Amino acid sequence: MLNDMPALTHEQQQLAVERIQALMAEGMSSGAAIAQVARELRAGYTGERVTLRWEEDTEVLETPAARAETDPYDSNPDDD
């Protein structure tokens, strides 16, 4: 979950994407370009702020218990 994120309009999001693409075209890595644009947005943004939450943040992830292997052709598994 990310707190205090700028609530961007579609147009602002598109401008951010174009800025990231321009930085990458100049040779910057995608991660560095995204980080730089994010810093720029946070530094100059004065509008509404929101909290972002991904579905994984709200789900309880459980691993099913491992089941013992059984032989589907063994009519009486206790006699082994």
Swiss-Prot record:
Alphabetized InterPro entries for the sequence: UPF0181 (IPR005371)
Pfam families per UniProt: UPF0181
Source domain of life: Bacteria
Record field: transmembrane: none
Chain positions covered by the region annotation Disordered: 58-80
Coiled-coil zones: none
Similarity comment text for this entry: Belongs to the UPF0181 family.
Protein name: UPF0181 protein SG1330
